[in-house]
Amino acid sequence: DIQMIVGGNVKRLEDVKKYIYTGAKKAILDMSKDTNVEIVKEASERFGSDKIAVMLNKDYDFSKIKQLKYDGVSLIIADSCANECIGLGIKILAFNCNFTFNDMVEFGKQDKVYGISDNSFAGDFDFLNFKAQLKEEGVNTIVFESAMSFDQFKKNSDGMIPVVVQDYKTDKVLMVAYMNEEAFNLTIKTGKMTYFSRSRNEIWVKGVTSGYFQY
C-alpha cells in the first residue's frame, strides 16, 4: 500500500491517464519538455489538481512559476532548486538538492514542504532515527508514538510488561515476550519490536539473528 508518484515518457494526455488509472497517487510532468508544459492545465482539469505534479530544474524560467498554481499543479518536484520554489502556495518535494542536515531542518520548517528525496537516503539508511532527529529539531514529521507511556502500564514483579505478539492480519499469536522501559522506548523509536531477555539479561531485537524482523 505504498503510494507512488510516477513520471517519465509522458508525451500526451493519454500517458498521464495510464499512470493515474493504474494507481499512481500523482503523475509527474517534466517542465523541461514543451509537450508536458502544454498539457499541464488540461491534465489538471481532467484528472484533478491533486493528481498532477511537475518537475522543475534550475534551468526553469522561474518568472513563469506562479502560473503553475493557476494551472492546477498540486506538487512541485524541485530538482536542485527547492529554495527557489518556496512561498508559492504549492507543496514542494526537494530532489537531489545536496542538502546538509541543517539545510534539511531549515527547509523542513518552511510552509508547504512535501518532503525531501536525496541519494544519501539509499541503502540501509536509518529513516526512523533520521526522522526522530528532525522531530527533535522542530520539523513536523510523522514518527511512531505510543498512546501510553511505559509508566502507565501494569507491570510484573520485575518491572516489565508482558507482550503478546500477534499477526496483524490473522490475529495468530506468534510469541510472548517481555519489555522493560528501554525495550519499549526502542520499539517506538525504531519501529522494530525490541524485547528484554530475562535469561540473558539483555535487550534484543527480534530478527537480528534470524532475519525475521517484527514491525
Protein language model annotation of sequence segments:
Residues K135-Y215:
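Binding-site signature for planar aromatic cofactors or substrates
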Residues K33, N57-Y60, N98-T100, S120-D124:
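Glycine-rich beta-alpha junction loops
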Residues K17-S80:
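Conserved anion-binding
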Residues D1-I5, E38-K58, C81-N102, E137-I142:
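Alpha-helix-loop-beta-strand connector modules within alpha/beta enzyme cores
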Residues V37-F47, M104-V143:
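C-terminal helical cap(s) of enzyme catalytic domains, especially alpha/beta-barrels
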Residues M4-V6, K11-G23, D61-D71, A82-I116:
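Catalytic cores of alpha/beta
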